[in-house]
Amino acid sequence: GTHILKPILPSHYENYQDAPANEHVTMLMARTIFKIPTALSALLYFENGDAVFVTKRFDVVDSGEYAGFRLSQSDFAQIAGLVPERDGEEYKYKGSYERIAELIRENVSAADVAVEVFFRIVLFNYLVCNGDAHAKNFSLQNSVENLDVYDLTPAYDLLNTSLHIPNEQSRTALDLFKDEDDFKTPFYEANGFYGTPDFMEFARRIGVVESRARRFIKQAIDAVPVMEEMLDKSFMSEKSKALYKENIRDRAKALGY
């Protein structure tokens, strides 16, 4: 198939009816406000009125000489060698974003560009309260023009998980740093959550230029009013719109400390 359909979540999640609209507006914000390459997607409705999130597969070539050809794609759990048999059921939550950035540098020829995009996605996920951006939600795939060249795939599975799991144990699915058991910034020690000092240290470690990292963080904080306008136009319930706005204000405040 060329598309993936994601209907409403099981009802034991909070605000479960809004899950398709949540993912739709979050992907839209990433693409239009933050200029992050994302999988193409849309929100459709079944005859009974239930919403369904539809995303276009980016591992299947849809036109030209190679139409129908499936590109080779590996997520970062696979690339890191994480398997449930050895690493347990929570294997995709092992590792760190810093380690993923290292693996990008090991496998992507245009690594500086790819690592910067990765930094922007991690920052965006933090802002929108996506607490499920684990190792399987980032992938590499080869190019149709050159099957030996790999690059970061468009971003996918972007949504505000706090709407559905309001008491998530952690703000991020993975630690920012490889040595988080032994290292914490003074900001994190004082506040118990990530802020700009943490993301600047993350940028330094993975090789994102300091001035550009600062600009991306400022853009994230400054984007909240435009994000709220887009949320107002979304297809979520009024309750979920209000919660989402509250969430991003809270994260922007954390970044703006």
Question: For the regions a protein language model found, what residue spans apply to each?
Answer:
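Conserved ATP-binding subdomain of kinase catalytic cores across diverse folds
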Residues: G1-G88
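Conserved kinase catalytic-core segment
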Residues: Q17-F34, Y93-N167
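Residues within well-ordered alpha helices
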Residues: M29-A30, F202-I206, M230
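Short, surface-exposed acidic
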Residues: L40, I206-Q219
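A glycine-rich phosphate-binding loop feature that marks nucleotide/adenosyl-phosphate handling sites
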Residues: Y45-A51, N137-S143, A220
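Catalytic-core segments of enzymes that bind and process phosphorylated/nucleotide-bearing substrates
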Residues: D75-E98, N142-E210
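Regulatory N- and C-terminal appendages and interdomain linkers associated
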Residues: E106, V113, N146-L152, I221-Y257
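Short alpha-helical scaffolding segments that buttress acidic/His motifs in well-ordered protein cores
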Residues: F118-V122, I217, M230
